[in-house]
Amino acid sequence: LQRAGFTGVEISAGHGHLFHQFLSPWSNRRTDDYGGDLRNRARFLTELISAIRSTCGRAFVIALKLPGEDGVAGGIDLPMASAINGVLADHSENFDLWTWVWGAHARSLYQHLPDATGARHPYLGDIHRLRAEHPTIHSGAIGYLTDPNECEMALNDGTADVVFLGRPLITDAAFPNKAASGNANRIRYCVSCNSCWRNIIEAGALACDNNPRVGDPDEHRELTLAVTHQRHVVVVGSGVSAMEAAHTAAQRGHRVSVIGNIDQVGGKTRLHAQLPGGENLSSVYDYQYLMARQAGVHFIQNRQAQVEDVLALNPDVVLLATGARASQPIWLTDDWAEMGLIPSLREMGQSLIDGIGRSPGRAVLIDHDHTEMTYAVALQMATRFDQITLVTSRERIANDVSLINRQNILQRLFDHDIEHICHAEPDSLDGLEAGRLMIKNVYNDKVSELSDVVTVVHASSRLPNQYLLKPLRANGLEVIPIGDCRAPRSLMAATHEGYHIANTL
């Protein structure tokens, strides 16, 4: 690394990695000089940093990332972390700074990437206390720091001398420059969704929900591909795909009009942002709206767009971003669907936000969705009903989220005593008026009864809202469906598609 031009290295001795395993009394069962008491367990690490210092010299920066609490019974807790610090402090001439991290490659894995389901910057208090034990050694702040003010706080109150940023720099590589120049309002904020982690693990490539330009050589600059011929782009819809396309097209030099059916932007992401753990999502559409306003986008809001509304704007091209709607699951018969007594996930989410009262009894959520918003609604339902039961025909819940987020979801569901039943689906709604829901096992058809049921909610697959597509094309317009209107997908797909479509116009 030094020969390649790097000025330092960080040794990752936390998060369950190899050096962590040597330090931990739970995982280190060795009986030689590298196991047993604490000094022996730390020997591998102390010998390593000594060798690096000897080879690379005093000017080469050596940082240590150490375990604070790993969440493993019999592993490393804060008292043990303090003891490890004491051993390493005796070798402080061989490293320049340290910090502490949480979680391990175990059921506590999710703790190493905290998100909005918990407190902001949750580890700073413990980092401050650990640092205070050896105040002459430089320390770093880390863990769910997404705002420049949080970083400044850690630097000013004695917690740290430097701040480590990972996910926020993926979302906006210019984060430090914008903060330093007084342009924090132009930062594209990390929403701590952990999609970057998932993409690296599952796809082998870096990607971000809120930064479609991640990985571009010039992503730290706000550059756009200027157009040679201005067009009037009408965007129908105001969700995140619509807004990404709108501000990108306007910054390129197009004239852009947005028609939205409410007076706010964000679409279904705005709903998710008001549910447990979703608050950071508001920064996605807040940024998009700010950029759109600054780029001169014209907004027509509180209007459910009809064909004549679009034609009246005389567009050169229409981006159709009218979202998606919940499908009717097979088990939901037409008579029950027509009565409107079994709401979709989104309908229940909106009712919870609107403030429906508390209801005794059991609420059943039929989960065919398996994404984060489903469990955000379930957790909010737990504040309004005596019991929540999740029913899914699949082999586990949260099947379509990353491992790290699934662990967090499971922890919170169990914390709230939310029951989940796998390999099952509704069999009959005949007893529902009497509070009974019959469910059957999808493999052996065995039927069982859920009692005291007061409401049933379905999280089903979604269908594109394309009611304007054919009539607009029949009027000779170029119409491009984007986002969920093209195909219901993830937040990442929505922002990326909006950005890339806008760059083809």
Protein language model features and the residues they cover:
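Short glycine-enriched, charge-decorated loop/helix-capping segments at active-site entrances
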Residues: G35, H112-T117, A273-G278, D335-W336
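Local beta-strand N-terminus motif with an aromatic residue
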Residues: F6, F95, A160, P315-D316, ...
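Rossmann-like dinucleotide/flavin-binding elements
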Residues: V227-I259, I300-N314, A321-D335, M339-V401, ...
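Short, structured coil segments at secondary-structure junctions
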Residues: H134-P135, G158-T159, A295, N314, ...
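Rossmann-like dinucleotide-binding cores of NAD(P)H-dependent redox enzymes
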Residues: R255-Q294, T371-P426
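Flavin-dependent oxidoreductase catalytic cores
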Residues: Q2-V236, V240, E244-Q251, R255, ...
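A conserved short coil-to-beta-strand element within the FAD-binding core of flavoproteins
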Residues: I300-L313, C422-R436
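Short acidic loop-to-helix transition motifs that present clustered carboxylates
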Residues: T146-N149, I170, Q304-V307, M348, ...
